[in-house]
Structures are given as C-alpha cells and as structure tokens.
Amino acid sequence: VFKALILGAAAGGGLPQWNCGCENCNLARAGHIPASTQSSLAVTMDGSAWVILNASPDIRAQLVVNPALHPRRLRDTPIAGVLLTNGDIDHVAGLLSLREQQPFTLYATGEIHSVLAANPLMQAVDSTRVPRMAIALDQPVTLLPGLTATLFAVPGKVPLYMEGET
C-alpha cells in the first residue's frame, strides 16, 4: 500500500528563514505558528523500503523525527533511493548528509547528474556505494516494486548557482 510522509513543506531556508522578518517568519520565531523544514517527501509501497523525493539541507532533522526512516540495526537505512526533481541547492544539499557509506540509488536526469559530478563537494557521495540512475524526461522509471515515477519538464529558471552557464 502506497504511503507518503511529508518531511518538510517550506520553501528554501525553511520557516522561519534566517534572513527574513516577514509576518510568518516572525510568528514562527515567536512559537505562534509551527516552524517547518524545507520541502521533501518520503514514499514507500511496503513500509520497509523508502525513496526520498529531494534531499533538503534539513534531511538529518527530517529523518530523526520520522521513526519509519530510522535504522533497523547498526549501520542500516530503510532509504532505498533519492529522487531529485531538479538541481536546486535546496533539493541536493542533503545528499552530503547521506554520504556515510550506506547504499541507495540516486535518481535524476542526466543533466542533474552531470551538474553534481562537476561539483567537487558531491564527490563525498561515493558513486560506488550510491549508484546514479539517469532518468529521461517523460519516461516512467521504477523506484520500488509497484512504484513508478515520470519526470517532466516544468517552466522555471535554473538554480542560482547555474545562472550564466550555457
């Protein structure tokens, strides 16, 4: 049975954002509305193998508060894969927290894999332990038995760190 856990629902920086004094951020700082981590989702078909959609910089905190995503024994993880929907820092920076030699599959478009491979920091996510699977747009891919995803292009801009690249 399909199950999803909303790990975080806030925009980049979370709520409150460190550099924002808007009403919502001030209310969250004062404890009047709940704070929220950055957007991410975990999905499963069986409750034992999970795929994370986007690895936010808050991923460690998100995993800590969700017992279904806790290790079941020493040096273990129920995370079978991470699917990146784009190359935004808010969606890839959490990969650095998942670098501790636990195997999982990293799903993304070929372009996003190339961007990550060109970044020396991302070499910490060892490709011999974390195989990369390139996904073509508009083509279904099986993430877990019984669970497929189809990535598709949406309008928008490239991540800030990629602006000006050709």
Per-segment meaning from a language model:
Residues 1-166:
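Binuclear metal-dependent hydrolase catalytic cores
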